[in-house]
Amino acid sequence: MPISVPQATELKDLFSLKGKVVIVTGASGPTGIGTEAARGCAEYGADLAITYNSRAEGAEKNAKEMSEKYGVKVKAYKCQVNEYAQCEKLVQDVIKDFGKVDVFIANAGKTADNGILDATVEQWNEVIQTDLTGTFNCARAVGLHFRERKTGSLVITSSMSGHIANFPQEQASYNVAKAGCIHLAKSLANEWRDFARVNSISPGYIDTGLSDFVPQDIQKLWHSMIPMGRDAKATELKGAYVYFASDASSYCTGSDLLIDGGYCVR
């Protein structure tokens, strides 16, 4: 059966996430894509399960702040996404604590700082296992629940690096993993067509602190290659996550949204 048309017709209702339960992986930093995606969903009324790998204190702090500020239920969970059993347990625990999962934002990831000849095999595997296999693990774990409930929205954080090969830095493993995430979203949009929507978001250079190790001259070169001439703030991505999480995007599946300041048009 096709996914039904929402009953709401006004934008304020279509964008509302009141009564929805949203999982966001990788939301333990003070700012960052996952944290801002979670905040955006909380602003629109969603109850949240946010995850961390090693920064328990940061995740607990974010959960407390969002709950108090937006008046929603927020709980932090530990989950190492490259382990399927942990993703499965995460979904089961959230269902036990919240009753259901409506939206899963698969955001946890790892960057790379070298090419395949200068990296070890272990470094390659670590990026692929976290960024691509980790996304698969999350998707499968929640997809079974979506299929059972016959509803759901999966939003995958990919990257503009899934569309292009970045210059001048070498990061083949990351580029390959993120290209895989984009195509995984498209494949699942078809596979899950009867019960859930699947979309991806491909950010460009975002000022989250993850690229602080990159020399300033290289970062200046990046900016010269971006039509808008700057990095984005993570807050500039919130609207995209709320859109894909909500009924405002009810006829949208298999889409990838580039948010890169125009980088990929050059």
Curated annotation (Swiss-Prot):
Sites where the protein binds NADP(+): T31, I33, N107, R140, Y174, K178, I206, T208
Source species taxonomy: Eukaryota, Fungi, Dikarya, Ascomycota, Pezizomycotina
Catalysis performed (reactions): D-mannitol + NADP(+) = D-fructose + NADPH + H(+)
Pfam family, one: adh_short_C2
Protein name: NADP-dependent mannitol dehydrogenase
Keywords carried by this UniProt record: Allergen, NADP, Oxidoreductase, Vacuole
Location of the protein in the cell: Vacuole
Gene3D superfamilies associated with the record: NAD(P)-binding Rossmann-like Domain (3.40.50.720)
A biological-process GO annotation: protein homotetramerization
EC number(s) from the headed UniProt entry: 1.1.1.138
Top-rank taxon, per record: Eukaryota
InterPro entries: NAD(P)-bd_dom_sf, SDR_fam
GO cellular component assignments: vacuole
Record note on quaternary structure: Homotetramer.
Protein family per UniProt: Belongs to the short-chain dehydrogenases/reductases (SDR) family.
A GO term for molecular function: mannitol 2-dehydrogenase (NADP+) activity
Residues annotated as the enzyme's active site: S159, Y174, K178
EC class of the enzyme, as a word: oxidoreductase
